[in-house]
Amino acid sequence: MAATSLMSALAARLLQPAHSCSLRLRPFHLAAVRNEAVVISGRKLAQQIKQEVRQEVEEWVASGNKRPHLSVILVGENPASHSYVLNKTRAAAVVGINSETIMKPASISEEELLNLINKLNNDDNVDGLLVQLPLPEHIDERRICNAVSPDKDVDGFHVINVGRMCLDQYSMLPATPWGVWEIIKRTGIPTLGKNVVVAGRSKNVGMPIAMLLHTDGAHERPGGDATVTISHRYTPKEQLKKHTILADIVISAAGIPNLITADMIKEGAAVIDVGINRVHDPVTAKPKLVGDVDFEGVRQKAGYITPVPGGVGPMTVAMLMKNTIIAAKKVLRLEEREVLKSKELGVATN
């Protein structure tokens, strides 16, 4: 009983959003009277979170524990995947986490990949494990995600972690949705009783964002107590507008450039852009990254807005580092029915 209680307290401390933000942030209701939205810097927030993780890692190591280790499996030659993995391993170095990238050709069989995952699952030196998505078409991504040990699943994609998140229980939260949640909480944007629209229903991004925002703030894994509407590819834009124009918070994770425009947003709303789209820039004649939101138009009307790039992206990497230290501390122990052994908790036994 004592072990379970102590585990819950330790898990709560690790998984709770921090409120010691050093950024000077404008109260939500005041942002609405500005001529232009407050642009939320995901880079600054991510830097703060990485500083918190680094301090936690060094305290963990100073207490006699081994330095956390993250293993990343990268399949194929997708340039975007290589870039994302490089960002993750660089962030790991910044926060004091050891990391390795295991590169495999796109021709690797599903069984070979499963065998590699099983080997890393059973390696005590590996605390966090992720397989960079997307994978080649001949490999079942869901089977691969479920093969990663839920205790090491720093992406939060295992069915156990997804299920526990949906039940408002402690779990490894998916990094991008958790990053969106932290942006909202650390910026001081209220969610209780507010109307939220999430554009996009993907199982790794849109759905988890909606779950985090609408669930009960008094539960084991506190939610936002918001009223959430989810749209998807079959939602006509005019129907979407009927919802967004009433929303206090609009989160777009659909992967459609200019999906959200100024006429769809009410004055003072918070707009979080999760979309990442490569489009042709007519000025430079080169590709450029944009989100789902017409940034220049919407910023004239919204209260808060995140840019692309520099918004949600850096937060995703920061939350991945947070999940890795959680995995290293073995706080969740999902495969052992959530109960830590007394010796792991430092509890004296007779």
Curated annotation (Swiss-Prot):
It is found in: Mitochondrion. Changing residue 168 to S: 82% decrease in NAD-dependent dehydrogenase specific activity. 65% decrease in NADP-dependent dehydrogenase specific activity. Reduced affinity for magnesium. There is a cross-link at residue 50 (Glycyl lysine isopeptide (Lys-Gly) (interchain with G-Cter in SUMO2)). Gene3D superfamilies: Leucine Dehydrogenase, chain A, domain 1 (3.40.50.10860), NAD(P)-binding Rossmann-like Domain (3.40.50.720). Its EC number is 1.5.1.15, 3.5.4.9. InterPro entries: Aminoacid_DH-like_N_sf, NAD(P)-bd_dom_sf, THF_DH/CycHdrlase, THF_DH/CycHdrlase_cat_dom, THF_DH/CycHdrlase_CS, THF_DH/CycHdrlase_NAD-bd_dom. Substrate binds at residues 84-88, 131-133, 309-313. Its cofactor is Mg(2+). One of its GO terms (biological process) is formate biosynthetic process. Although its dehydrogenase activity is NAD-specific, it can also utilize NADP at a reduced efficiency. PANTHER family: BIFUNCTIONAL METHYLENETETRAHYDROFOLATE DEHYDROGENASE_CYCLOHYDROLASE, MITOCHONDRIAL, C-1-TETRAHYDROFOLATE SYNTHASE, CYTOPLASMIC-RELATED. Belongs to the tetrahydrofolate dehydrogenase/cyclohydrolase family. Homodimer. This NAD-dependent bifunctional enzyme has very different kinetic properties than the larger NADP-dependent trifunctional enzyme and is unique in that it requires formation of an enzyme-magnesium complex to allow binding of NAD. This is Bifunctional methylenetetrahydrofolate dehydrogenase/cyclohydrolase, mitochondrial. The gene is MTHFD2.
